């Protein structure tokens, strides 16, 4: 599958012109991650966005320790959720600049596009309309995730 199709299907390139989609594909790099490999680690400072388009990833997070750094517990990270193909990970760190909140590990052979933070920010800032459309699309994706999490929480609390 080509980069443009992946970006359109995941929603990041929705409502973009062909020229804008080309800008996005020009900075996207394809990567393959074998089972067990880490795409990003909890507490890392990186801000790249990944678009998973084949395979499954697991989100792992260490349990918190009162008054300690998030990774200071020494306990084994726990699985949080599984994301299927065409899912976006890393968007929160891109937006707020904070460290990664979870480790993302390939559960099988994973293929992903990577949008490097520095190049993405550069093209978003150089074309305000493009930047607006991209951020609007990213917000729509985040809203879907929050709504899904709210439903899961509601189902968990009221069952």
Say what each PLM segment does.
Residues 1-159:
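Cytosolic regulatory regions built on CNB/CRP/Popeye-like sensor folds
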